[in-house]
Structures are given as structure tokens and as C-alpha cells.
Amino acid sequence: MNTAAIDQTDARPLDTTTAPMVDPFGRAVTYLRVSVTDRCDFRCTYCMAEHMAFLPKKDLLTLEELQRLCSAFIAKGVRKLRLTGGEPLVRKNIMFLIRELGKEIEAGRLDELTLTTNGSQLSKFAAELVDCGVRRINVSLDTLDPDKFRQITRWGELARVLEGIDAALAAGLKVKINAVALKDFNDAEIPELMRWAHGRGMDLTLIETMPMGEVDEDRTDHYLPLSEMRRRLEADFTLSDIPYRTGGPARYVEVAETGGRLGLITPLTHNFCESCNRVRLTCTGTLYMCLGQNDAADLRAALRATDDDAYLAQVIDEAIGRKPKGHDFIIDREHNRPAVARHMSVTGG
């Protein structure tokens, strides 16, 4: 990890009116993804090993520290903030952080606060999320088959997730379904999943499996290029490319037969690096400038070194200056190893 020292005597005060941070390749960094915990109540086979060793709780940033870091990024031009995990809603007292960050929207300093969830806790928190200023969420859901759902999550209950989605829609949240396309597992039911999502007014986004972290299965067995999935869908559906964007990497098509939108996230077959506008913060204060690279900055040390947010801003600037041009994702069929050693649950999915 690169933790180059920075002279605190050169610290400059934060300027909330400054332009967004710009990386060495001219990309404005306006989107922060924050993993508030590495813990999850599921153990999805492509995301985690079944017997994960979670981070000691003493290593995690407090919610107040996470709030301070998020505020520092907002002051430096971040306009969109997404909370992830693990499963963000299993973090104790997480609504404190969400409510505090919602105040940034009220003050006009943040355009959007959202989160990615597995849906298991939505029945409990959906209405409160809306009250805190959250307007849309992503729900990870790879199958509508209860047995397959239990198989891929290892112990999840599909009915609980579907109840959570119903609660979110009833509360007024805009819901997008994220599904990892897996060969010989859920590829045959993606048309059904798409019809179901579109019939309820939800977008569906398909994602190629990403080679991150050691898991208990061989990813190459289930890797499915979305170019192939699109060709299959076009046998039964009319897909038209549209310019719709949500600030993320998905490219969207409109499905004439359902009237809904289908997103495609293709980190391996068609990467999105040239327009990358985001960085990722872990629950331990590590900042990853790229999902598919290992270079990182230790913001926890800067956070705890001083109460001076100007020093923290300098450390952030130095990190953004190291944001790479692109990731190194590749499916390594020869050696059966991930391109990046850390799990997605640590980085933030």
C-alpha cells in the first residue's frame, strides 16, 4: 500500500465551492462508494468463501468517522454517494450514518444518497430510508427460484427478499435489480427475471462475474460474456440502445416487449474505465482508486492523525493523483486465480 507522507504544514482549508477532483487522465471524480461493513447475512458463492474470516470490529471505522470522511469527499466535489457492504443494513446503528448523510442533500451539497443491498433488511428499514432522503436503491437478486436462491446465497430466504422489495416499492423507493449472469446457473431464467422486474416498474441490470477474491468455486465454470447473453435475448426481444445513464458503468437498452430498461455492466468484455468517475472507501478507511487494482491510500491514519480536515483533504488529493487509467480484470483460466485478491465484500459491491 502506498502511504506516502504528506507535510501537514502545507495543509489548505477545505473549499466547498471548488470544482470536482480530477484524476491524471482528466476524469472528474464525483462518485464515492462506501463499504460500511464487510459482514453480510448471505454468503453468495461468487462473492465470499463460505467460512469467511471477517475483519475484527476494532479495525472498523466508527460511524462518526465514516461520516467525517464522507463529508470530506463531499466538500471536494463528490455529488453522489452509495453505501454498500457486505450488507450495509446489517451494520449496527447504520441509520445514524444514513440520516446524517441525508442532511448533505438537504443542504444542497450532495445530489444523491443511495445504497446497494441484498434486500433482506428492507422490510425493516425501507420507510426510514425514504425519510432520510434516499430515493432509489439497488437490490442484488440473481434468481427467482427459491432453491437456487438458497444455493447461491448458501442460506438466504427468497421470500424475505421479495417482501423487502415490496416494502421498498410501497415506501416510494425506486428499485433497480442487479443480477450477476452465471452460465449454467441463472442464464436460462434471465428472460423471466427481466419480465418480472419490468412488470413491477424496476430496471434490471446484468453484471459479468468479476475475478475478485478466493471463493470456493471455479469462476471460469460460470463466466458468461454479456455479449452472448444479449444475443440470446435478441432471439425473443427487441433491444434498442439508449443514452440513459445513472452515473454508473451500465450501458442501457430498451426492451420493446416489456417497455422496461435492461442495463449491461461488462468489466471484462467491454470495460468502462475511460469514463470512470468513482473511488471506493472501505469500512477500515482504505481508499481504492480502482476496483481492479491493488493500489490504495490509508485514510484512517490521516483521519486519526489530526482533527484538521485540510490535512485529510491533502491525503485524498494525493490518492486521486494515483488513480490508474484502467483495471486489470481478466479471467485466469490457466491458473484459476482471481485478478484481485481482496473480496468484493471488503471493497464494496
From Swiss-Prot:
Record pathway: Cofactor biosynthesis; molybdopterin biosynthesis
One GO MF term attached to the UniProt entry: metal ion binding
Keyword Cell inner membrane: no
Residue span(s) of domain Radical SAM core: 24-250
E.C. numbers: 4.1.99.22
CDD domains reported in the protein's UniProt record: Radical_SAM, Twitch_MoaA
Alphabetical keyword list: 4Fe-4S, GTP-binding, Iron, Iron-sulfur, Lyase, Metal-binding, Molybdenum cofactor biosynthesis, Nucleotide-binding, S-adenosyl-L-methionine
InterPro entries: Aldolase_TIM, Elp3/MiaA/NifB-like_rSAM, MoaA, MoaA_NifB_PqqE_Fe-S-bd_CS, MoaA_twitch, MoCo_biosynth_MoaA/MoaC, rSAM
Database matches in Pfam families: Fer4_12, Mob_synth_C, Radical_SAM
Positions bound to [4Fe-4S] cluster 1: 40, 44, 47
Tagged with keyword Iron-sulfur: yes
Record-listed [4Fe-4S] cluster 2 binding positions: 273, 276, 290
Biological processes, Gene Ontology terms: Mo-molybdopterin cofactor biosynthetic process
Binding site for GTP: 33, 82, 116, 176, 278-280
Catalytic reaction annotation: GTP + AH2 + S-adenosyl-L-methionine = (8S)-3',8-cyclo-7,8-dihydroguanosine 5'-triphosphate + 5'-deoxyadenosine + L-methionine + A + H(+)
Cofactor(s) needed by this chain: [4Fe-4S] cluster
Note on cofactor: Binds 2 [4Fe-4S] clusters. Binds 1 [4Fe-4S] cluster coordinated with 3 cysteines and an exchangeable S-adenosyl-L-methionine and 1 [4Fe-4S] cluster coordinated with 3 cysteines and the GTP-derived substrate.
Positions of S-adenosyl-L-methionine binding: 46, 86, 140, 210
Family named by the database record: Belongs to the radical SAM superfamily. MoaA family.
Role: Catalyzes the cyclization of GTP to (8S)-3',8-cyclo-7,8-dihydroguanosine 5'-triphosphate.
Subunit composition and interactions: Monomer and homodimer.
Protein name: GTP 3',8-cyclase
Organism: Rhizobium meliloti (strain 1021) (Ensifer meliloti)
Lineage start: Bacteria, Pseudomonadati, Pseudomonadota, Alphaproteobacteria, Hyphomicrobiales
Gene coding for it: moaA
